[in-house]
């Protein structure tokens, strides 16, 4: 269960003091600074704001995923994996049900958010304490206008139709010790108990979930041993989870160099309506790469275990109830869904089967859209016979593979903002590390590049960004404008 971060503000100050203070009074100074920031800016800041030209509004909604760019006849679809609605006991500030029924305001926040962020699908991952008590279609919480998705006479999902006609697919699943996504039905009982079935943590449990129609993922890989992952042999593993950044008990496991205390102090500044800070950029303070998870991901692929990676929103709307300067809580469903997502590449109709197949095959990449929407990214291998091999596939070195890549550009560059610095990289898995094998700057990468891998191994593409275009929206937090990942692509495995 996640702890409410507002209650952690004293802890935030203490952690920031412990790790960065130069004097015994640093905690008091930090608290005073934050209080002053929340109350009013100083005169110098006022003058700077007054003198600055008006900035174009930072977009709070996202464009259709197709704007990221079709590749080789496949269309990107924006997918959230690992999200909690009213059938998780800890969602909605711990009140998913009110007076015997679902927390309707919280549910409506969720439904509104999936439309505002132009999602194409959400794979719900509810906790056993509630999902085991209801029929699986109940988890969808369908409302008038929703369309059921039927398979074999059973409801296995639903379409939510947005006001502008866009549709979002909702698919049930669970997160406990294992994370089955895309369940068609409840798993078979264990000892006559559905709760025990949902809490399974062994290969037999993995098999029961697969028989119920799901792909099985391991969530919070930072809390798992590599031996456990090998034994369970899941279909997917998380390589980033925002909860692993903000969870006090796991943040330094997932990201050992991350200063959670300072991050929370910084986030408090986004509450000040006069600060000039754009609240949807609070992610720049909260984010750190989950290096523990990425290390295990490298280990798996270096062993030839081609298990695709996903990013997990782990949205509950229960962690940061503090209202930021836009009048919206810090962890609103909209804000978290806007931060990042998984882009699955689908040829033809987008439906439950095609979404799951793209995830299973690793034909997907993670985009951190908090920094802006990238367009034009592409990564595949081409063998000497001219065949294209997509992310997640295995190719023989004997077939002469060459990587064909194209770096993205910012979809909506806006005057008078500076352009971001972008770099395209290729990494090779070597044990528990991803070692950079090649890189290109943004202009060269955007024109398209080719590179021949020198030896067998697992290779993945990554796009890095220094979001200079966001700098004017972060007065006082310019140090947070730094080199960060924009895209994580799934690997391609080259065998002898």
Regions found by a protein language model. Give the residues of each.
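A metal-dependent hydrolase metal-coordination microenvironment
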Residues: 56-262, 275-278, 287-292, 296, ...
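C-terminal functional module detector
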Residues: 53-76, 80, 84, 88-93, ...
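Long, structured stretches of catalytic cores involved in phosphate-ester chemistry, encompassing
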Residues: 268-286, 300, 349
């Amino acid at each position: 269960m996640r702890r409410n971060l507002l209650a952690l503000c004293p802890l935030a100050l203490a952690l920031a003091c412990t790790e960065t203070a130069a004097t015994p009074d640093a905690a008091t100074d930090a608290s005073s600074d934050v209080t002053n920031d929340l109350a009013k800016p100083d005169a110098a800041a006022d003058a700077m704001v007054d003198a600055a030209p008006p900035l174009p509004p930072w977009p709070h909604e996202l464009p259709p995923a197709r704007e990221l760019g079709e590749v080789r006849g496949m269309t990107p679809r924006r997918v959230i994996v690992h999200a909690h609605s009213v059938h998780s006991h800890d969602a909605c500030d711990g009140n998913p049900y009110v007076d015997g029924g679902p927390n309707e305001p919280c549910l409506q926040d969720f439904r509104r958010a999936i439309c505002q962020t132009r999602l194409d699908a959400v794979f719900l991952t509810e906790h056993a304490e509630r999902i085991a008590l209801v029929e699986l279609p109940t988890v969808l919480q369908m409302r008038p206008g929703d369309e059921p998705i039927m398979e074999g006479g059973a409801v296995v999902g639903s379409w939510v139709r947005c006001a502008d006609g866009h549709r979002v697919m909702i698919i049930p699943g669970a997160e406990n010790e294992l994370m089955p996504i895309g369940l068609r039905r409840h798993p078979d009982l264990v000892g006559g108990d559905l709760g025990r079935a949902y809490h399974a943590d062994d290969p037999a449990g993995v098999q029961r979930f697969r028989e119920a129609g799901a792909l099985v993922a391991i969530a919070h890989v930072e809390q798992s041993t590599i031996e456990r992952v090998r034994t369970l042999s899941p279909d997917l593993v998380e390589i980033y989870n925002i909860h692993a950044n903000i969870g006090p008990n796991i943040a330094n496991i997932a990201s050992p160099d991350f200063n959670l205390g300072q991050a929370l102090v910084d986030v408090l500044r986004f509450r000040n309506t006069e600060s000039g800070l754009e609240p949807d950029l609070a992610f720049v303070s909260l984010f750190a790469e989950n290096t523990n998870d990425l290390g295990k991901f490298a280990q798996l692929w270096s062993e030839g275990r081609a298990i695709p990676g996903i990013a997990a929103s782990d949205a509950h709307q229960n962690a940061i109830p503090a209202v930021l300067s836009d009048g919206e809580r810090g962890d609103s469903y909209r804000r978290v869904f806007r931060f990042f997502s998984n882009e699955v590449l689908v040829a033809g109709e987008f439906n439950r089967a095609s979404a799951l197949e793209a995830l299973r095959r690793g034909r997907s990449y993670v985009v951190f859209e908090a920094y802006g929407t990238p367009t034009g990214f592409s990564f595949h291998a081409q063998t000497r016979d001219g065949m294209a091999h997509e992310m997640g596939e295995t190719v023989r070195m004997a077939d002469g593979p060459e990587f064909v890549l194209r770096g993205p550009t910012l979809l909506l560059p806006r005057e008078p903002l500076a352009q971001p610095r972008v770099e395209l990289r290729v990494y090779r898995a070597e044990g528990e590390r991803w070692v950079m094998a090649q890189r290109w700057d943004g202009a060269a990468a955007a024109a398209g590049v080719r590179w021949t891998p020198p030896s067998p191994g697992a290779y993945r593409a990554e796009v890095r960004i220094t979001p200079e275009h966001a700098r004017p929206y972060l007065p006082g937090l310019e140090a947070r404008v730094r080199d960060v990942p924009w895209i994580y692509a799934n690997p391609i495995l080259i065998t002898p």
